[in-house]
UniProtKB/Swiss-Prot annotation:
GO terms for cellular component: extracellular region. This is Crustacean hyperglycemic hormones 5. It comes from Penaeus monodon. GO terms for biological process: circadian rhythm; glucose metabolic process; neuropeptide signaling pathway. It is found in: Secreted. The modification Valine amide is found at residue 120. It comes from the Eukaryota. Pfam families: Crust_neurohorm. One of its GO terms (molecular function) is neuropeptide hormone activity. Transmembrane segments: none annotated. SUPFAM superfamilies: Crustacean CHH/MIH/GIH neurohormone. The keyword Secreted applies. Hormone found in the sinus gland of isopods and decapods which controls the blood sugar level. Has a secretagogue action over the amylase released from the midgut gland. May act as a stress hormone and may be involved in the control of molting and reproduction.
Amino acid sequence: MSLGLIASRLVAVALVVVVACSTTWARSLEGSSSPVASLIRGRSLSKRANFDPSCAGVYDRELLGGLSRLCDDCYNVFREPKVATECRSNCFYNSVFVQCLEYLIPADLHEEYQAHVQTVGK
């Protein structure tokens, strides 16, 4: 066999191995829930990015987003890191959330926000 023929066969074998490995790797990612696999598939890391695991009630992105924005606004007013985290603790069922609610939201909307906390909470 000539040197050129051997080289071309080695290149062909290498290509087959690379293609086989890449398709096997891609198939293994299809069922994977790792963050890397999610990024490769072009999906977000989590459908429930704002989800607090302490919230055992109904998962409603809109309600959770509204409650979370209240905590963000409260943090922006007071600029203390503990405000943002404590406001969200126990699925918004805490005294910091109530204080933020009283400070930022008109009184006629308090019951609505408290109902949202009950819906997403325990």
